């Protein structure tokens, strides 16, 4: 997974891993691509997706807003990342991927609703809505 604060966060880092996979002929190793983590480093996610087509198998989806206090995670359809456009771009380059949701809602009484809304949003975007 491309994780902030590690040596794997930029497109170049991910491509190095991809080239390593190629050099070693590793058939069952793929990249777990976290869109939000990448977006924080480089907002033009759509430009890296075609380059990593061969290596990504798993897409991790979460969204956030940013202000003077830092990053605050929100439901998928309410944040800074335009998942509808990004998922459309993903569909242009991939046939078979696994998508997952990550929800950081801290208030227990809101968590189920945030997960439900995020799931419905992701499902809509995946299915062309």
Regions found by a protein language model. Give the residues of each.
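Histidine-acidic metal/acid-base catalytic patches
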Residues: 8-33, 39-129
């Amino acid at each position: 997974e491309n994780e902030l604060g590690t040596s794997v966060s930029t497109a170049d880092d991910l491509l190095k891993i991809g080239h390593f996979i190629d050099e070693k002929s590793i058939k069952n190793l793929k990249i777990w691509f976290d869109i939000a983590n990448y977006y924080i480093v480089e907002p033009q996610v759509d430009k890296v997706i075609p380059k990593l087509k061969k290596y990504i198998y798993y897409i991790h989806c979460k969204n956030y807003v940013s202000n003077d206090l830092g990053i605050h995670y929100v439901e998928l359809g309410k944040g800074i990342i335009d998942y509808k456009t990004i998922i459309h771009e993903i569909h242009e380059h991939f046939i078979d991927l696994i998508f997952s949701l990550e929800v950081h809602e801290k208030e227990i009484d809101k968590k189920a609703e945030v997960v439900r809304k995020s799931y419905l949003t992701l499902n809509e975007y995946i299915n062309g809505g």
